[in-house]
């Protein structure tokens, strides 16, 4: 890549907005607080900290949902703010160039909107790359003739792709991801423990289950019937049971991709293993469940949720593989 203008890789996820340039990677909560007139009052970590504490005249908005832009002007404003925050100073973005990760399932209109968000944020030139192809590069398996099966567990979608020679040959997607678990945990706590918990507490319990060695996890909430503050407990076994539908989704997706792939590539996957990435890749017990269910190696990519944006940055130097908007 050249050095005269700023270069950046972008992954506009539903939960996190990720950037990568020649210096480092950044990750911001992809959320904003807007008032009744639609004016931006807070974004990123500041907005997330205000969730559940807002007065009636303010509301929390996520500009990207299930990988698709739901609010183009707001998405552009947040991206512009993130780019300026990452630059370390409020300089203009004139002449900046970017490569943006585009979901494999995106329609031509959705791809156009993603590029438009980048341009409205101040990016001069935008190139795009399929999310699975970027992830393959980030996982270190791009360009190889051997087959690689990557599974992206996002906030609201889970996708599995067979990659060979830097191309996604087969992709399957389900509209359910790690974020679904939070809603299920909230419902489970309410129905089984008469405890009302928020999305943040549910997410904390989900993540703690992956690290906790004990059998029980304390959770703070409100008594469902009286509304008084209450500290309850969820067992690791309960959380794992709530996670099971996601496990089963991933297993079905992997099986569907293997069934639709040439036998030579399937053999490669049985030797190399399935590669998990995305924000939900480290869900408690997921890799172990898949190893048992699929009878093959399963690995969590070290870069996790940053795999695609890291790969997009690596691919950006190979301009011909990217589509110029």
Q: Model features per residue range: what roles?
A:
Residues 1-150, 163-274, 281-308, 313-325:
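Nucleotide/phosphate-binding catalytic cleft detector across ATP-hydrolyzing
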